[in-house]
Amino acid sequence: MASQEHPNWLTALLADTRPPPKLFAWSPANIQPKLDEGIDMGSSNSDEEYDNDACVCPSTDSDQRIYIIGPGNIGRLYATHMARHPNALPITLVVHRKELLSQWAACEGVGLADLTSGKIFLNKRFTVEWWTETRPPYGPVKEVADGKKLHNVFISTKAEAGLSEADRIRRYLGRCSSVVFAQNGVCKLWPPHGPLYISHRYPSGDTPTFSACVVSHGVASAGPFLSVHAAPADAYIGPVFWASDPESPWRQPSDDFFIRHIATTPLVNTKQVSSGEIWLLQLEKLVMNAAINPLTALLRYKTGELFTSYGSDDPLARVIDKLLWQTSAVIQGLIDHETSHSVITSYAEQMSQPGTSCSVPKVRKKLTERFSQPILKAKLYAFGLKIFEHRSSMLQDIEAGRKTEIRDFNGWIVDTACFLGTGLDVSVHSGLTGLIERCERFDKMELGRALL
């Protein structure tokens, strides 16, 4: 079978030859004729911490400012704690709807309830903007970053919107820009498709540094600008694509300012890793998401309920087994593919002892074992039982009537199998994608009949 040349998202972007749009940065002042500057935040007590005085005041200095695009649960988590960084920088929250500007004006700021400490962190010392091609009819007229370049961008939207958001702002990105994707799924800028996208959208020598942040913290929404940090965990950050130094083209951006800033942000426990390691971590998280999310959504189960039976007579256990065999085959095929050589080499160099050369074939063999079906199954069952009461994000999306991330989980498996072009069976992933998009609901027996 011949491999597919490009996935649909890349085909659409390659066909788009329009110049990047000029974007206006609306603020609450564009919604209300005058916004009261003095907002009573109340008096603090042992259960509430207000960061009014601790946070850096708003500044027009876009060289230092952090822009968080998509301040949902993960965005609020990082905004809250980046504002408490020992060397805190001014932060702008970029919302996706105009109405959120009015809601921001009326609320007490970003709220993060920490269940471990029992504290509620409240902070209103952020700038909030809505970026649009529409010029505001009244109030101050301001272009994004005053028409200059954005330096520190943290994109924490749903996975589907991540690259489209970065693409929309490419007018304001360049070699000085560091863009971090903190989302589920596998970043679209990895080989094999990322380099072609970059060369199509950016002039040579003016490419931003693009990184991925894999977040394991459990954070739930409790309303607009309010989240609950229910399950503290850890996170990892590493580079995906960067403008190489002609003198040392293989050198990774370990000294990238924004990556270091995130890695030193208190209380989010974000570890800086190599390009190869962050790729593997994204793949491992994808394995969990591609199993747990669609199955819990279709069965309306809590996560742990998926893993109460190993028996071959249980239709759900058989579905999980087959799904993992298919996942394993696709990821192993990707590991062996020539387009993965650079990230495999990055990981091999990280794993090698000082003064010794790395063996890429040996590393590939170890990674093939790491993504074997029995290993993936053991990790999945252990993880699922550990978070037994957890309600997956896809289950919550289905119940709320929202669009899911199924195309970035199981759809990615299907697309990658198509790219590899070796005739791999991905029928379970393809079937799950269709069932989720039709908002089906099954019991275990019905699910087995639909997928086996």
Swiss-Prot record:
The keyword Cell cycle does not apply. Belongs to the ketopantoate reductase family. InterPro entries: 6-PGluconate_DH-like_C_sf (IPR008927), 6PGD_dom2 (IPR013328), Ketopantoate_reductase (IPR050838), KPA_reductase (IPR013752), KPR_N (IPR013332). Substrate binds at N289, N293, S393. One of its GO terms (molecular function) is 2-dehydropantoate 2-reductase activity. The lineage of its organism: Eukaryota, Fungi, Dikarya, Ascomycota, Pezizomycotina. The active site is at K285. It catalyses: (R)-2-hydroxy-3-methylbutanoate + NADP(+) = 3-methyl-2-oxobutanoate + NADPH + H(+). Induction: Expression is highly repressed by the histone deacetylase HDA1 and the beauvericin cluster-specific repressor BEA4. BEA biosynthesis is also repressed by the activity of the H3K27 methyltransferase KMT6. The keyword NADP applies. GO terms for cellular component: mitochondrion. Its EC number is 1.2.7.-. Keywords: NADP, Oxidoreductase. This is Ketoisovalerate reductase BEA2. It is an enzyme of class 1 (oxidoreductase). NADP(+) binds at G70, P71, G72, N73, I74, G75, E405. Pfam families: ApbA (PF02558), ApbA_C (PF08546). Ketoisovalerate reductase; part of the gene cluster that mediates the biosynthesis of beauvericin (BEA), a non-ribosomal cyclic hexadepsipeptide that shows antibiotic, antifungal, insecticidal, and cancer cell antiproliferative and antihaptotactic activity. Ketoisovalerate reductase BEA2 catalyzes the NADPH-specific reduction of ketoisovaleric acid to hydroxyisovalerate, a precursor for beauvericin biosynthesis. Disruption phenotype: Decreases the production of beauvericin.
